[in-house]
């Protein structure tokens, strides 16, 4: 009744996924929809339910006059990156260290809750391509590597902020790393923060994700909504 969005995915009588969003206003005064929660029960994951939920959210948003949806996600979680950047076509412009403070749940306990803001500009060519099931995976060939994975550990390289693009690789499964080697998980968190936060603060954005698990971080202008 107040411009919010609530949806659920049912299998029989069981709710297996749900999403909730509300109106927001950015610093420039532009109205958007902020997706506060979207989740799929663990046993139903990897069935494209999450992406179907987001596409339903997009259709609802356009019907109600929104052209942008935002939400937070953990940039260290590889499946999050793949869903958001490849399946949905979002862009990322903001990085917030320890966004939620300490969280005691099984996924986050003991790890800083760094988050990025996914910005889903619903009418850009990138999103329209994703909507038509075009493969948005990109090649990192020829791009300098700022953060790589060697024997499961993060290795950073100093690359000038004046460069045009860099790659930042992610661990294969940070959730597993957190449960088995929390010190290594923290090392990954701080390394990715060190590479992403200064660049995004300087006007860069995450423009893509490669097939072998790296963010493409670009120092160029964002695409405008058509």
Question: Could you tell me what each predicted segment is?
Answer:
Residues 31-42, 164-180:
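Conserved acetyl-CoA binding element of GNAT-fold acetyltransferases
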Residues 44, 48-56:
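Conserved acetyl-CoA pyrophosphate-binding loop and the N-cap/start of the following alpha-helix
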Residues 72, 82, 89-108, 208:
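Conserved catalytic-core motifs of GNAT/GCN5-like acyltransferases
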Residues 179-201:
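A conserved acidic, glycine/proline-rich C-terminal tail/linker
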Residues 132-166, 190-195:
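Short, cationic low-complexity segments
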Residues 61-74:
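Conserved GNAT acetyl-CoA-binding A-motif
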Residues 99-131, 218-225:
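C-terminal "cap" of GNAT-fold acetyltransferases
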Residues 1-42, 207-210, 220:
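A conserved beta-strand-loop-helix scaffold within acyl/acetyltransferase catalytic domains
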């Amino acid at each position: 009744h107040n411009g919010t969005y609530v949806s659920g995915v049912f299998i029989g009588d069981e709710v297996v996924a749900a999403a909730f969003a509300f109106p927001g206003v950015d610093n420039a005064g532009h109205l958007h929809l902020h997706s506060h929660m979207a989740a799929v029960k663990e046993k139903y994951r990897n069935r494209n339910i999450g992406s179907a939920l987001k596409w339903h959210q997009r259709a609802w948003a356009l019907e109600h006059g929104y052209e942008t949806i935002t939400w937070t996600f953990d940039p260290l979680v590889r499946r999050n990156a793949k869903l958001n950047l490849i399946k949905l076509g979002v862009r990322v412009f903001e990085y917030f260290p320890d966004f939620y403070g300490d969280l005691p749940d099984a996924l986050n306990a003991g790890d800083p809750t760094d988050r990025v803001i996914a910005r889903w500009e619903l009418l850009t060519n990138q999103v329209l391509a994703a909507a038509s099931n075009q493969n948005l995976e990109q090649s990192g060939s020829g791009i300098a590597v700022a953060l790589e994975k060697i024997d499961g550990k993060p290795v950073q390289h100093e690359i000038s902020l004046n460069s045009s693009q860099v790659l930042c690789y992610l661990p294969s499964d940070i959730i597993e790393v957190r449960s088995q080697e929390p010190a290594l998980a923290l090392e990954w968190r701080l390394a990715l923060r060190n590479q992403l936060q200064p660049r995004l603060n300087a006007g860069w954005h995450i423009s893509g994700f490669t097939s072998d698990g790296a963010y493409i971080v670009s120092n160029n202008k964002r695409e405008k909504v058509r």
